[in-house]
Amino acid sequence: MQESRDIGSPRTASVGIRLLVLLATLLGLAVAPVHATARGAAAPFKVLALYNGTWDAAHINFVHEANEWFPQQAAQNGFTYTASDNWNLLADGGVDEYKVVLFLDDLPQTSAQRAGFERYMRGGGAWMGFHVAAFTTEAQSWPWYHNEFLGTGNFKSNTWGPTTATLKVEDRTHPSTKALPATFTSSVSEWYSWSNDLRQNPDIKILASVDPSSFPLGTDPNQTWYSGYYPILWTNSEYKMLYANFGHNAMDYDTNTPLSSTFASETQNRFLLDGLKWLGGAGGTQSPAAPTSASARTAMSQK
């Protein structure tokens, strides 16, 4: 009988309560880091890639590559990837839900698309463009994009055929290039030059250019660069943007067979991923607000 009374005694109950409290505390310590990690995990940012995909086999092949490569990188790098050939998403506000917009092989063609893109960028959107996204021989038809945003003006020349280039990293403090070596070998591409000297534009920060050790650059003597200064990667400090000169694979045009891959350079891929993370908000800064141009306001009012 005495044993039965001891089990229910205040002293025994007190010990039991203390044990329960200790157990609860230990369980709380074990679970807390999991909840803290879950609360601290950033939601993936959304990326929209716009493409044309209908002209020049090399550009089409790049689009196919990009639409395979970026989704493969998405989960481990904190973003989601959607590809579309509907450029009217720029005109009707369909891009507003995306943190970053990519132009893979073209640029907006209608006034509504152009006005929508300008509004998106001035409103804090982010952009990465490749190769032909800067191509034009009529910069005056969209001066905000070609002269202010990109700073390039008109297309001036290109190399041919597509080759690798040794690139000199000019700014190793920018989030997109801080992990890159002083020089690196690019993937194969055709390379463009433009009428405007980007070095003279105070808003343009050139991140990488053709290293002189690359010359001569090209395989056709009539379309080879033998000397000069050629920007390859840059940003505009007035916007959250990055432009990359590459995006044109070597091709066997007789059989439409690719002879190279834009994503063959691991160092170049590092730029793409670090740049995309910066654009998506990892360590970046807010885009400066800027007034919309008169042409954009007119186009938007006509929607």
Regions found by a protein language model. Give the residues of each.
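N-terminal secretory signal peptides that target proteins for export/translocation
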Residues: M1-V15
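Extracellular ligand-binding/catalytic regions of CAZymes and related secreted enzymes
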Residues: A41-F45, L50, N61, W69-Q72, ...
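Sec/Tat signal peptide C-region and signal peptidase I cleavage site
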Residues: P33-R39
